[in-house]
Amino acid sequence: MSAGIGESRTELLTWLNGLLNLNYKKIEECGTGAAYCQIMDSIYGDLPMNRVKFNATAEYEFQTNYKILQSCFSRHGIEKTVYVDKLIRCKFQDNLEFLQWLKKHWIRHKDESVYDPDARRKYRPIITNNSATKPRTVSNPTTAKRSSSTGTGSAMSGGLATRHSSLGINGSRKTSVTQGQLVAIQAELTKSQETIGSLNEEIEQYKGTVSTLEIEREFYFNKLRDIEILVHTTQDLINEGVYKFNDETITGHGNGNGGALLRFVKKVESILYATAEGFEMNDGEDELNDKNLGEHGTVPNQGGYANSNGEVNGNEGSNHDVIMQNDEGEVGVSNNLIIDEETF
């Protein structure tokens, strides 16, 4: 028999499909790790084949198969490095070389016992020659002992033999029923594990979505807080008389422009505090926001409207400055204010 090294893909696929009763068309299909696991199981017969996923499609399922394979290598002291990260990519060359090595190992260590791949995929225990001869070894001393008894003992022994024979038949029936139940339970367990894996994937996707939404929420919340700080700062400056333009513009008295800035600020404030129908403010969130504002002086200002001293700087971080400052330090109202009542 060939050692397997240097064999063509056709020869290897023929050997693999014949050994495991599969229908692989390409060497790359071995990249899932399932076939590798069953090749080792055909040698040692101790792999948990119910956990091996032959219909694996996700990378985490491939990883599960290779963990089972590596456990087998460790258990039997096989010194072979398995490059899982290369094999799971299902590339031809990597899987060809590993399959060649596996066939060589199989030729060296496989005994003459018959291997049933279909039964093992359903996780039926392999019956070896040693296990088949064990009942005979146990029964021989008993038979010899009974043959040396007296006539009365022989009669009793005959009755016992009949009973033991009957128990043996019932026991074998009970064992076969237990095996059937075991296969059904293992199939159900495999299905449950697949469902759990699918649900875990969905959970990871939802976590990513929630993380993105939280980032967006913080981004827009900070913008609204900046606008709120700007509105309150402007109102304070108006009330303190910091603005050096006539009172008619500020208060709306007389025949002038009439409180354009103040009306604008009030409109912005009303928009900020407007709520949808059925919406209730959360007092806990308000207290938290006030606490954050008190600790840091102001909420981080993305628009550059107010510094930590409450001073307004309209020349940083905004393309639509509402409050402007001239070279002499005097504060003025921008001509870009929206004051048309219909706009609101």
UniProtKB/Swiss-Prot annotation:
It comes from Saccharomyces cerevisiae (strain ATCC 204508 / S288c). GO terms for biological process: 2-micrometer plasmid partitioning; cell division; microtubule depolymerization; microtubule nucleation; mitotic sister chromatid cohesion; mitotic spindle orientation checkpoint signaling; negative regulation of microtubule depolymerization; nuclear migration along microtubule. The modification N-acetylserine is found at residue 2. Belongs to the MAPRE family. This is Protein BIM1. Pfam families: EB1. Gene3D superfamilies: 1.20.5.1430, Calponin-like domain. Residues 6-107 form the Calponin-homology (CH) domain. Binds microtubules. Residues 188-281 form the EB1 C-terminal domain.
